Amino acid sequence: MKETKQLPGITREAEEQYLARTIRVAEQNLERNLAGEKKLADDLHDLMESYGAKDVEALSMLHNTQIIYEETKRDRERCERARKKPYFGRIDFYDEDLKKDEAFYIGRVGISENITDKVVIDWRAPVASVYYENALGRCTYSVKNEKTYEIDLHRKRTYEIEDDQLKDFYDSDVVANDELLTKYLAKNKKAVLGEII
C-alpha cells in the first residue's frame, strides 16, 4: 500500500519557510562549531603552557587535540559554505522499498538538525545522483557495497537563492517545453555545478 505524506515546499510560501528553517539550522551548526573551535584552541594553549617537551603523555594529548582542532576548523569552513548557499536543488520521489514519498534538498554541504534529521543532503550522497542523472519517472540509484534502490521520481527542482532570499525556483517537468527558459536553466546549472566543483 502506498503511504503518502505532505511533502515540504510545494508552494512558494512553503519553500520560503523551509529556506528560513534551513538557514536557522545552518547558523546554529556554525555557532556550535565556532564554540567548539574556540574551546579546542584554548585547550591547545593550556597544554602548550602546562607541559614540558619531555612529557610524552602530554605531547600525545597535544598531538590528538591538534588533530581534532584541525578537523573542527574544516567543519567550520563547511558550515560557512552551507550557510552562504544552503541548497540548489531538490528531488521528490516515491521510494519503492519504503513504500512512501520522500523529498530531499541537495546542497554543496549536508546540513543536519540532529543525527537523524537531514535538512539538506550533500550533493555527493548516492540518492543525490538522481538529480543529475535521471529524468522524471521510474529510475534507480545505487549505494556502494549495499544495493540498488528503485524509485519513481516526481519532481526535480532548481533554486536560485541570493542573500538569504529565495529568488526563484524551477521544476524540470514544467520548463521542458520552454526553449528559452531551458537554455537559461542550462546556463545556471553549469554555474551551479562549477560552484560545487
Describe the function of each predicted region.
Residues 1-196:
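Extended, charged low-complexity regulatory segments
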